[in-house]
C-alpha cells in the first residue's frame, strides 16, 4: 500500500522498533492516548510528548491534519508503516494514531526517538 500524502518524512527502518517499544513501555508505565481523536486533543492541549501516526491509513484525511497540527504546536511526531503494528504495540487490534502523554519508564527511549526525528526533519528541511 502506498504511503499517504500526509507522510512528511521517511522514518528509518531502524527507528520503527524503538518507536513501537516506546509505545509499549509507555502504555505499561505511563499514559498513552489511542486513536486519532484522542491524539488530536492531546496535541491541541499541548500535553503530547510524542505522536505516532500510521502510514497506511485509509482514507488519508483521517490523520492528514496531525502532522500539520504537531508542527503548529511544536509537538514531536513520527510515522510507523502500519496501523496493525501501531495497534499491537498498544495492546489493541489497530489504530491510526497515538500520543504519549507520560512516557513513564520509557523516558530514555522517547527522548532518543524525539532526538532522532528532529535530526531527520532538520535534514529534510521540514
From Swiss-Prot:
InterPro entries: eL8/uL1-like (IPR050257), Ribosomal_eL30-like_sf (IPR029064), Ribosomal_eL8/eL30/eS12/Gad45 (IPR004038), Ribosomal_eL8/Nhp2 (IPR018492), Ribosomal_eL8_arc (IPR022481). One of its GO terms (biological process) is tRNA 5'-leader removal. GO terms for molecular function: ribonuclease P activity; rRNA binding; structural constituent of ribosome. It comes from Cenarchaeum symbiosum (strain A). It is found in: Cytoplasm. One of its GO terms (cellular component) is cytoplasm. Disulfide bonds: none annotated. HAMAP family: Ribosomal_eL8. Part of the 50S ribosomal subunit. Probably part of the RNase P complex. Gene3D superfamilies: 3.30.1330.30. Its main location: cytoplasm. NCBIfam families: eL8_ribo. This is Large ribosomal subunit protein eL8. SUPFAM superfamilies: L30e-like.
